[in-house]
Amino acid sequence: MYQRILLAYDGSASGQQALLDCHEIAQWSGSELTLIAVMPLPLNNLGLEGGIYNETLQETEERRYRAILDTGLRKLGDAGLKADGQVVTGDAVSEITYCAQKIKADLIVVGHKHLEGWAARWWRGSVSKALIEQAPCSVLVVITH
């Protein structure tokens, strides 16, 4: 029986499905839910073209990730579930693992979309694959096509 579930939520189609599955598991088990939205690290003071990093862009991204998280929390609330949530900044796998340890999660739920072609898989990598290797607890990978 799960007591604490951590959902890494990004608002994507696979994230939406993970939210639905997480909702069902939490209802069934009476688990505490925590949602996190992981925002990538800013490029320090340099942009991709070597220019100065735009602080306004960083604030816009923070608002965007906060809106994604709030949408997930609202959907769970509408379904009668209480959940905590936070936006974190950093490497997705490191931040998810850290948060899972911090809240003593016994299940991490993530969405995953199968990518077509080896180049897409190589370029993008797989957070879920790396997470399975590093997670301090069980990981449920919700797959969409």
What are these regions (language model features)?
Residues 3-52:
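Small/aliphatic-rich secondary-structure junction motif
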Residues 137-145:
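Short, flexible loop segments at boundaries between secondary-structure elements
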Residues 110-133:
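Glycine-rich, Arg-bearing micro-motifs that act as flexible, cationic patches
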Residues 74-108:
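Structural beta-alpha unit
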Residues 53-67:
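A short acidic, glycine-rich active-site loop
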Residues 51-54, 102-104, 126-128:
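Short, hinge-like loop/turn segments at secondary-structure boundaries
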Residues 34, 84, 140:
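Conserved beta-strand positions in the Rossmann-like core of class I SAM-dependent methyltransferases
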